[in-house]
Amino acid sequence: MTITEQKAAQRKAGIAARRALSDTERTRSNAALCARIMALDCFKKAENILLYAAFGGEADLSALAVEAARQGKTPAYPVCGEGFSLTAAVPGPDGWEVGAYGIRTPILSRSEILRPDQLDLVLVPCTAFDAVCRRVGMGKGYYDRYLPRCTRAVKLGAAFEAQRVDAAAVDAHDEKLDGFEIGRASC
């Protein structure tokens, strides 16, 4: 099986695994994930944080965004652009729309834009990941092109335990992350 075929299989399995979580498991796992990230030094020290609006069963970082704003941090969100580019945008109160791929996205004209080198922490979704911080995304390479430009940021993946694989199928151009935080339901 080629790397492309392996990625497709891992992507499909990871999406199915996260969608298979019950509402209770998802709620508990999201809460645990956000609490773990909030306890990290990189979160405590960060001023500008790139989050994402959860889509298709992704780990939901909404509680983290609320807490970041409460602490005076600046939560930004990715906006997909031409040429598979990303822009980090801090939306205003009426600055949201449904963007590419049906994802809730900031409206650039109503948002403050942060340069990649202004970000202190970047939280990245995935469909599958492994123990050595490699990830399989949705397949367009947006984050793989963006992350190298985030020169001072800690880059963390956010996912559910059910999305873990033994070895993520990656190519040379796939960006390795600094770590992963995993949502695990607990009793």
Regions found by a protein language model. Name each.
Residues 2-118:
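N-terminal active-site beta-alpha-beta segment that forms phosphate/nucleotide-binding
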Residues 50, 102, 122, 128, ...:
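Conserved beta-strand segments that form the floor/walls of ligand-binding pockets within enzyme
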Residues 55-57, 127-131:
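Short glycine-rich anion-binding loops that position phosphate/pyrophosphate groups of nucleotides
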Residues 1-5, 16-19, 107-108, 117-122, ...:
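Surface-exposed, charge/polar-rich loops and edge strands
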Residues 10, 33, 142-143, 176:
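Internal, well-ordered alpha-helical segments in soluble enzyme and binding-protein domains
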Residues 14, 51, 75, 123, ...:
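A residue-level signal for conserved active-site and pocket-lining positions in enzyme catalytic cores
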Residues 66, 138-142:
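Charged helix-capping and loop-helix junction motifs
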